[in-house]
């Protein structure tokens, strides 16, 4: 589309050539179109705030549902979220707000392995978030970036710059500090320290598996998307549509649907609020995709990268505000180091994009669609 625009701008109109002088003046270079000054939709502050708010909303709503007493219907939660997402984007398509291709059995067959990786990723992510606090979960999610980067090196011939490597070191350091702060607080706090440490260890194991699943999903999607040529909402449509039947089967056969367990997961006093949070968490994934595309359109991809890095801080702080996450010097230090690592990584990506494209990580080179990038950011958040 951009190439077509360039061609139109520099096309020579033969009837405008001065036949007497046998010469002509080249048309002036195209001027950037400034958005209408009075339009709220073109105010760069609004999409940035909307994107950050959507990311926080999704994480907080998921944590609220998963932090219930002995919640164990994770597959059902993910199924509801996928169903809500399909209804939402289909409604938006009917209203002309977004567009994506119609369902094709052949495309579904090609994409189904990616959907299975997605299910593994979101399930292990929900289990990790269930056992860990939001700040620790957010910090450890940064480790996925390292796995993806070196996966690109192994399978796509990429390379890692020195600044990127430095950001990786900060990510690992922040994760070590966060784990140490969590275990230290569990040992020193009142109650059964052994049980608390055991819960944290389970969370760390789920987090490790989630990082592996997430990197496999992102790398697999990068390779598979060449076969389907999916755009932003095509990916969202097929991911959620294909995951629904799988999640229904997994929930029906692997989860306890006895009346006792259902009442434990959905206490009568909190049932409506839990269901509302489940629906809202499903809508938030659509909000993230839409607001990230809005953010890139109104600002720039560079600004969007920095917003994604800065967004880690409010997400981590939301865990301190809305939930009983320990506020100690080590835990705050881990958040700060993780925040700085995100900024350094974003700066490294920006510098890579500014350099010639030889010898640079493929993840930084191709122009990534806004909602595809936002999907990666939401998985890290």
Swiss-Prot record:
The keyword Lipid metabolism does not apply. Its main location: Golgi. GO terms for molecular function: GDP-mannose transmembrane transporter activity. Coiled coil: none annotated. It is a multi-pass membrane protein. It is found in: Golgi apparatus membrane; Cytoplasmic vesicle membrane; Endoplasmic reticulum membrane. GO terms for cellular component: cytoplasmic vesicle membrane; endoplasmic reticulum membrane; Golgi membrane. The keyword Repeat does not apply. NCBIfam families: nst. Involved in the import of GDP-mannose from the cytoplasm into the Golgi lumen. This is GDP-mannose transporter. It comes from Aspergillus niger (strain ATCC MYA-4892 / CBS 513.88 / FGSC A1513).
